[in-house]
Amino acid sequence: MRKLLTTFVCVWFTLAVWAGDGIYEKLQQIPQISEIQKLDVKPFQEYYQFWFEQPVDHSDPAKGTFRQRVLLGHKQSDAPVIVELEGYNIWSSEEGELANILKGNQLTIEHRFFDQSVPEGGIPWENLTIKQAADD
């Protein structure tokens, strides 16, 4: 998760600096992101579901990749970013409690190998470890 979180922190700082372009265009420029879908979720000004490509095994990238589901709710570039890490699945696309209280943007990440964030061809259970999840 640390690599994914680091990537998204960098994305958010970049988003705050890039004036004029929409979030959609900015997300399209990140090579690991695919299938960006705009959704209408209030109170966010922009809201997207997309997939982030991750290695199945961070210690052996030759084992292939899987797509991890991510939801991004954007209110404004100078708002804090609340990161929600979801196990089992993403239960709701609604604004979370902290995003509501802090009037923040929200990044919701589905845990590896749960719900829609699974490799094609089955789950290699030996790669569902705390270390692998932390490396995501």
Please describe what each predicted stretch is:
Residues M1-G22:
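Bacterial Sec-dependent N-terminal signal peptides
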Residues V9, S93, D115-S117:
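Active-site-proximal flexible loops/turns
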